[in-house]
C-alpha cells in the first residue's frame, strides 16, 4: 500500500512505433485535475487530435487509477477513458478490482495506449 496519492509519472505505450516511454507529470496538473477521471480528461484532450476517428490509430485509450487508489484509504477504482465510437465525444468506464492498485504500485499513475500495431501484441 502506498502512502502517496500520486507517483508523478505515466507510461505512454505507442503501438505504431513499438515504443514505451515514461513521462513526468507536474504536481500542478495533479492538483488541478485530481487523478483518475479528471487526469484522463486532461491528458486525452491534450493528445487526441480534433476530428480523430474514434476507431482509428489517432485515438488514445487511457487506464487511469483514481487519486486515492492504493493509498491507506483503500481506494480501488480506476477509469478507462477514450474518444467514444458511440458518440464521437468523451467515453469512460469506471471499474473496481485489483487492477487500479496494482497499476499504482508499479510506480505509474496511468497508462496511455496510442496507435495501431501491425500485428497482435501483448502490453
Say what each PLM segment does.
Residues 1-123:
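Acidic carboxylate diad motif detector
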Amino acid at each position: 500500500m502506498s502512502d502517496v496519492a500520486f507517483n508523478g509519472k505515466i507510461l505512454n505505450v505507442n503501438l505504431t512505433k513499438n515504443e514505451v516511454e515514461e513521462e513526468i507529470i507536474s504536481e500542478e496538473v495533479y492538483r488541478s485535475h485530481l487523478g483518475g477521471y479528471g487526469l484522463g480528461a486532461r491528458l486525452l484532450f491534450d493528445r487526441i487530435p480534433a476530428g480523430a476517428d474514434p476507431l482509428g490509430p489517432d485515438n488514445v485509450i487511457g487506464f487511469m487509477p483514481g487519486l486515492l487508489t492504493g493509498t491507506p484509504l483503500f481506494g480501488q477504482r480506476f477509469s478507462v477513458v477514450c474518444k467514444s465510437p458511440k458518440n464521437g465525444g468523451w467515453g469512460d468506464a469506471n471499474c473496481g478490482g485489483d487492477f487500479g492498485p496494482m497499476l499504482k504500485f508499479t510506480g505509474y499513475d496511468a497508462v496511455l495506449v496510442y496507435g495501431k500495431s501491425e500485428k497482435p501484441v501483448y502490453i
